[in-house]
From Swiss-Prot:
Organism: Campylobacter fetus subsp. fetus (strain 82-40)
Gene Ontology MF term list: ATP binding; proton-transporting ATP synthase activity, rotational mechanism
Subcellular compartments: Cell inner membrane
Xref: SUPFAM superfamilies: ATP synthase (F1-ATPase), gamma subunit
InterPro entries: ATP_synth_F1_ATPase_gsu, ATP_synth_F1_gsu
Subunit composition and interactions: F-type ATPases have 2 components, CF(1) - the catalytic core - and CF(0) - the membrane proton channel. CF(1) has five subunits: alpha(3), beta(3), gamma(1), delta(1), epsilon(1). CF(0) has three main subunits: a, b and c.
A GO cellular-component term linked to this record: plasma membrane
Principal location listed in the UniProt entry: membrane
Entry's family note: Belongs to the ATPase gamma chain family.
Keywords associated with the record: ATP synthesis, Cell inner membrane, Cell membrane, CF(1), Hydrogen ion transport, Ion transport, Membrane, Transport
Protein name: ATP synthase gamma chain
Gene Ontology biological-process entries: proton motive force-driven plasma membrane ATP synthesis
Disulfide bridges in this chain: none
Length: 295
């Protein structure tokens, strides 16, 4: 009987877990729809800013334009220090979502170290911060509570110090890494070099839908405002895109957990029925044996 009680207790425990994971899946599904829509709209705007900025970068390099912002487009400058801003979740239970980003960062660190290039980390998200702190890896700046509730103002705060360091010469390159939303069931690592801005090929510029002519006297002012928006929105989009990917990963993880719990309940139910049958058989044998002994 004690065995039957143990199995019954396990069944109830797994069923409770199943209810929890199912509820978490439903919550993640609802949040995903909202985050997915925000990421889709943000991506259109981010891509357009990148397109226009790349054209300006191309013209600066083509016509050898020199100004206070030309440092942002100098791809020939030597790279001795690299700042990597990476985004992970503040929470777990989302499968390999955080691990994928962490593995990418570790590989990048090793690659740059092999080239004698110093790497500085700026971490957004509790899970990434905890991992690298545990590993004893120095983190220049840490931000918690942002990846789970991103806003444009928060994004500005994260990217501002990295760009200031780049302008001051404290770093030679700023890279943004996050696990982005691909579709409902998959995510992909996205690595974006924020500065220096990469220059497109002549063919890409000539076929660009945003090709424009800018008056020389307005170049500096337009470029300054555009650069500011580019930095801020690149960071904001990474946060929004990462959040959508996090929800899709958690939805999938909770769906798998629910299915596993369902299968486990079925196994335990079979074990319970078998144990109960054996218990009844044993009791019948004991009764029959008792009757026989009385004859």
């Amino acid at each position: 009987m004690s065995n039957l009680k143990d199995i019954k207790r396990k069944i109830k425990s797994v069923q409770n877990t199943q209810k929890t994971t199912k509820a978490m899946k439903l919550v993640s599904t609802a949040k995903l729809k909202k985050a997915e829509e925000a990421a889709r709209h943000s991506r259109v705007y981010a891509l357009k800013i990148n397109e226009v900025l790349s054209e300006i970068a191309y013209k600066i390099n083509q016509f050898k334009i020199v100004g206070k912002d030309d440092k942002f487009f100098d791809l020939k400058a030597s790279i001795n220090k690299v700042d990597i801003i990476f985004v992970t979740a503040d929470k777990g239970l989302c499968g390999g979502f955080n691990i994928s980003t962490i593995k990418t960062i570790r590989n990048m660190i090793e690659e740059y170290k092999s080239k004698k290039i110093k790497v500085r980390l700026r971490a957004v998200g509790k899970k990434g911060i905890e991992f690298f702190n545990f590993q004893g890896v120095e983190i220049l700046e840490s931000y918690k509570g942002i990846s789970s509730a991103p806003t444009y103002d928060k994004a500005k705060g994260v990217i501002a110090s990295a760009i200031s360091d780049f302008v001051a010469g404290a770093t030679d390159k700023v890279i943004l890494v996050h696990n982005g939303y691909k579709n409902m069931i998959s995510q992909e690592i996205r690595i974006n070099t924020i500065v220096p801005v990469e220059t497109p090929s002549i063919e890409n510029v000539e076929h660009s839908s945003s090709l424009m002519e800018i008056e020389p006297e307005n170049d500096e002012k337009i470029l300054e405002e555009l650069m500011k928006k580019y930095f801020e929105y690149s960071m904001y989009y990474a946060l929004i895109d990462s959040l959508a990917a996090e929800h899709s990963a958690r939805m999938q993880a909770m769906d798998n957990a629910t299915n596993n719990a369902k299968a486990r309940v079925k196994e335990l139910q079979l074990a319970y029925n078998k144990a109960r049958q054996e218990s009844i058989t044993t009791e019948l044998i004991e009764i029959i044996s008792g009757v026989e002994s009385m004859k």
